[in-house]
Every structure is written in C-alpha cells, then in structure tokens.
C-alpha cells in the first residue's frame, strides 16, 4: 500500500526594510521558480488597503506630525491619530500572519514533494515595531503608544526567515524615493537615517533573542541594569553609530538592540529595574522574535536584478 503523500514544505521568507529602497522591485525581478523547480509565490504590500480604503494612511501618517507642529493638533490628539494609523497599517499583516501560521508545521520534514517558497513583502514587525519606534525617536509618537503597539506583535512559528534590506547611502535612498514619485511620500533624510538605524538594530535584536530566549531571563535582567538611561543625548549615537557585523553564534550586547531605547525612567524603578508589566512586555517581545532566522542585506549600489539573483 502506498503511503500518503506529505504536504509540501512551506518556506517563508520575509523581505523587509525602510520604505523606498526597492523591495517590491526586487520581488518583481525574482523568478517564479527555483532552479530545482520549486514554485516561488509572492505576497506584496497591501497598498490598495492602505491608500484606497477610506483614509489614505500614507498621506495621513506624514501630515499628522506636521499638523501638530503647526498647532492644529495637540500632542495627545496627534499621538492618538498616529496610533490609529499604525494599527491600520498592521491590520492586513496580522490577519494574513494568523492565517499563514495555522498552515505552518512546527517541524521541517524531508519529503518527496517540491518545497513551496513564499516571499512576503514585509513582516508584521514593520508596522508594529520598526515604524512606531522610528516615529517615537523622531518625537512623533509617544512612549505610551509605542508600548501599546509592541504588545500586538504575534508569536512567530518556527521556520521564519527575515531578510532586512538597508540602504545607508542617503543620497541614493532619496533618489529612489523621488524617482517613484508616490503621492504623500516624503524623502525626509532624518527619518530615512533613523529608519535604517532601527532596522539594523532589529537584526541585532533578533540575534540577541536567538541566544537569550527562553532560558536566559535572569541574565537579561542583569544586563538591563547595566544599560545607561536612554536620554536625548544617546539618540544621535543610536542613529549614527557604526554596527560592525557580529558572528551570529556570539551573544549580542544588549545596548546594540532595540530594547536599549526603552531604558526610560517612566518604565523603571529608581534603581533602573523595569517595572513588572514592562518587564513582561519586553521579555515577551524577545520570546516572539527568538525563533526568527535573520540576515542583513545592504543593497547599496545594486540593481534590483542583482539583488534578486543573490
């Protein structure tokens, strides 16, 4: 009697990074099959949902801070609007992630059925973590709303591959944004610089989580106490400091991760220890990231076809 055929193994690859550097173009340039014949299925950004369903979220996200700076909105009003906008950016990703996670087996098995490769334009971490952190560092998003946002990050099933693309060359980044000329987009150099730094730090954060969770909570808490307070003086250092590649088998210093920006007196006791609820939230963030396989991909000077063939 013939044994029942196993379903094909699903390989998930998320392509993420700052906006305007050409992720969608890279996906378009990718073939539909691997050299071995495995199909490559592509899932693009839900741009129609973002821009055509009621409010144009891209325009609103850029206009709201300007309205606050112009006095048309209070800080509280601006924070609430930005939180709502970021939540709506995240909604399609969370919905699809929930559906996809139900199809992912916890264990990768060898089978005679060709693998299916699913290439996705962005992971939920973009709308829930990276863009809110960037807005927070720019003074456009409150710490309270940021904490509320990261609670929504879903637990990741094993087998997630995250490729973070960055473009440190600001001139090239600005040129790419201007050349596509999308309504409502702005080539704000400060935001682009901050967003690239946040994404580079995301890679360090995932690598830290890979070697810390789920068994090193006490060690993490001791490292936390040694972090300096994240005052305004550390902001420029966070954005501009070099980030040399560290071997993935080496434990990443905590101060290279995104968690360092949460060392704020609003979240801690006088001795720097996290208050219990925030400790749960940040440790929960690490446990949600620790199963992700991550790599950093600097696409400076590369064409989209060159990127797609690597």
Curated annotation (Swiss-Prot):
It comes from the Viruses. Substrate binds at residues 86, 182. The keyword Transferase applies. Its EC number is 2.7.1.21. It holds the Pfam family Herpes_TK. Gene3D superfamilies: P-loop containing nucleotide triphosphate hydrolases. ATP binds at residues 17-24, 176. Catalyzes the transfer of the gamma-phospho group of ATP to thymidine to generate dTMP in the salvage pathway of pyrimidine synthesis. The dTMP serves as a substrate for DNA polymerase during viral DNA replication. Allows the virus to be reactivated and to grow in non-proliferative cells lacking a high concentration of phosphorylated nucleic acid precursors. Belongs to the herpesviridae thymidine kinase family. This is Thymidine kinase.
